[in-house]
């Protein structure tokens, strides 16, 4: 993978994770983060430039979907789950 495409992929990966962390709903947030990490790990050994470009284009579309869903989730927020309200144990 060329240096520029590697940097582009890393920027896209970080942007997707950053945007996913903005989900208000715990289940959506954890699912999106897990799915992004799994997808990038699964495709990390792809060498074909055409396939890499197709995956980058798909990731860009997915980033747009994540942004839209985060925005919709913020408009129609719900109460936090019990798991989100737990305090972290003190050391």
Swiss-Prot record:
Q: In which pathway does it act?
A: Cofactor biosynthesis; iron-sulfur cluster biosynthesis
Cite the entry's keywords alphabetically. Mitochondrion, Nucleus, Transit peptide
Q: Which GO terms describe its biological process?
A: [2Fe-2S] cluster assembly; [4Fe-4S] cluster assembly; iron-sulfur cluster assembly
Residues engaged in binding pantetheine 4'-phosphate: 6, 44
The primary site where this protein sits is mitochondrion
Extract one GO cellular component term from the record: mitochondrion
The reply on keyword GTP-binding is no
Keyword Cell membrane on entry: no
Q: List N6-succinyllysine occurrences by residue.
A: 47
- What job does this protein perform? Stabilizing factor, of the core iron-sulfur cluster (ISC) assembly complex, that regulates, in association with NDUFAB1, the stability and the cysteine desulfurase activity of NFS1 and participates in the [2Fe-2S] clusters assembly on the scaffolding protein ISCU. The core iron-sulfur cluster (ISC) assembly complex is involved in the de novo synthesis of a [2Fe-2S] cluster, the first step of the mitochondrial iron-sulfur protein biogenesis.
Of which family is this protein a member?
Belongs to the complex I LYR family.
Assembly behavior: Homodimer. Component of the mitochondrial core iron-sulfur cluster (ISC) complex composed of NFS1, LYRM4, NDUFAB1, ISCU, FXN, and FDX2; this complex is a heterohexamer containing two copies of each monomer. Component of the cyteine desulfurase complex composed of NFS1, LYRM4 and NDUFAB1; this complex contributes to the stability and cysteine desulfurase activity of NFS1. Interacts with FXN; this interaction is nickel-dependent. Interacts with the cytoplasmic form of NFS1; the complex increases the stability of NFS1.
Q: What is this protein called?
A: LYR motif-containing protein 4
